[in-house]
Amino acid sequence: MSPRRTVSLITLGCARNEVDSEELAGRLAADGWTLVDADDGEKADVVIVNTCGFIQAAKEDSIETLLNAAEGGARVVAAGCLAERYGAELAEAMPEAQVISFDDYAHISERLEDVLAGRPLTPHTPRDRRTLLPITPVDRSQAAKNHVPGHLTFGEEITPLPDGVAPASGPTIPRLRLTGGPVANLKIASGCDRRCSFCAIPSFRGAYLSRKPEDVLREAEWLAGQGVRELFLVSENSTSYGKDLGDVRALEKLLPRLAAIPGIERVRVSYLQPAEVRPGLIDVLTGTPGVVPYFDLSFQHASGPLLRRMRRFGDRERFLELVARIRAKAPEAGIRSNFIVGFPGETDEDFAELVAFLEQARLDAIGIFGYSDEDGTEAAGFDGKLPEETIKERVDQLNQLAEELMAQRAEERIGSTIDVLVEDVLDDGAYEGRAAHQAPEVDGSTILYADTALHVGDIVPATVLTAMGVDLVAEHQEDADTT
């Protein structure tokens, strides 16, 4: 009998990383590893830290987490974006951890066996992963099987599978949910073909690659069988979904099919590029039962000249027109976006354009980030860098404005009826959940009061009583239907 081998996973960064961690967990569980939860005080033989390498703060958090994991005495493996981006350089700087690449995910059990046996792994030399797939999008699918997490198809099903592990006939890879609850991330694509001057993600996440609709649907059906009520579709750019499959309207066709899966009550889409949001997509997002009218729009700024310097499209007028089109279809729609402040060359006039846009757009959720140079990006070589104190002042000013604007938008919902997905039962007998305009973790939540007992996973109608910043307080409508 094989000795018990234990592993724990720590996930940092975005929802896409969470899906990758569940892929790793599924592979390991299928190969006989026991997953343990470090938060419960259980010690693992190996700790995998799925790192984030997006911005400097995320890199620092990843390094600190790796060091903390090593202090516990376990063997530590660095996976994810920081590991992929820096490879051998990270391994040399951090002897406390072994470093693996995305290319190692298909062989993760073998890599951990080597780590347990004391055999050092050979760290990879980073390369631009956009070069691993054909330039023509429609030629990428077959080549992706060896290079992109979440896109491998097994030759045969792994049997028997541990409880809770999705079979290869569902998702294209085994997946083990690491968190319970009624919401799950569902990856529809990987990589990005855009060349934004500030962003390094395409270089280590690779070229854009859509998952086949049939694979996405099978995984969604499996998630529904696990008790999931809301699907959160994730990718680096969801509006490009299907372009490499020969169908630029593939997302518009996929969404109604996902919403029709028994047990799935909500489908939410993340990360939409404003320049790619077609009228037909707006119609589907605002008019399909089960698809929430939620728009995670990547504006990044509102000054036309500065956006062009970022290698992006649009300006304040065009973005306001897009917001107006959405709200004309669905006044209750949730709209969120992130913005970069202090990009090289940002003038007082550029900054004023952004302020004016925020004041006029009345977004539901706003994220503000100060610009910092990223290794290997075009913008790192730009002139016109702003002093750090100027960037900080502008970030502070916009954060204050954003808090005021988000609070005002939340207050506009007082008295309205919302549908709340119950996610937690609080100690005082109240419930916490989210309305349709609130995405997991980033857009606030709703505190719900009810005279009758509710359960996690219920979706109930409620009247908004008040707002606390972006958060809402609501009362269950007892005489209405609960789903």
Swiss-Prot record:
Q: Which PANTHER family match?
A: RIBOSOMAL PROTEIN S12 METHYLTHIOTRANSFERASE RIMO, RIBOSOMAL PROTEIN US12 METHYLTHIOTRANSFERASE RIMO
Which residue range or ranges hold the TRAM domain? 411-478
Location of this chain's protein in the cell: Cytoplasm
Q: How is the co-factor bound, per the entry?
A: Binds 2 [4Fe-4S] clusters. One cluster is coordinated with 3 cysteines and an exchangeable S-adenosyl-L-methionine.
Residues annotated as binding [4Fe-4S] cluster 1: C14, C52, C81
Q: Name one GO molecular function term.
A: aspartic acid methylthiotransferase activity
Catalytic activities: L-aspartate(89)-[ribosomal protein uS12]-hydrogen + (sulfur carrier)-SH + AH2 + 2 S-adenosyl-L-methionine = 3-methylsulfanyl-L-aspartate(89)-[ribosomal protein uS12]-hydrogen + (sulfur carrier)-H + 5'-deoxyadenosine + L-methionine + A + S-adenosyl-L-homocysteine + 2 H(+)
Per the record, the similarity remark reads: Belongs to the methylthiotransferase family. RimO subfamily.
InterPro entries linked to this entry: Elp3/MiaA/NifB-like_rSAM, Methylthiotransferase, Methylthiotransferase_CS, Methylthiotransferase_N, Methylthiotransferase_N_sf, NA-bd_OB-fold, Ribosomal_uS12_MeSTrfase_RimO, rSAM
Q: What is its main location?
A: cytoplasm
- What does the record give as the function of this protein? Catalyzes the methylthiolation of an aspartic acid residue of ribosomal protein uS12.
- Kindly list the positions annotated as binding [4Fe-4S] cluster 2: C192, C196, C199
Q: Which UniProt keywords apply?
A: 4Fe-4S, Cytoplasm, Iron, Iron-sulfur, Metal-binding, S-adenosyl-L-methionine, Transferase
Required cofactor(s): [4Fe-4S] cluster
Xref: CDD domains: Radical_SAM
Please list the residue ranges annotated as the Radical SAM core domain.
Answer: 178-409
- The reply to whether Flavoprotein figures as a keyword in the UniProt entry is no
Q: Does the keyword Lipid metabolism apply?
A: no
Would you tell me the Gene Ontology cellular component terms? cytosol
Q: Which Pfam families match?
A: Radical_SAM (PF04055), TRAM_2 (PF18693), UPF0004 (PF00919)
Listed EC numbers: 2.8.4.4
Which top EC class applies here?
Answer: transferase
Q: What is this protein called?
A: Ribosomal protein uS12 methylthiotransferase RimO
Record-annotated MTTase N-terminal domain positions: 5-117
Q: Which organism is it from?
A: Thermobifida fusca (strain YX)
Q: Which GO terms describe its biological process?
A: tRNA modification
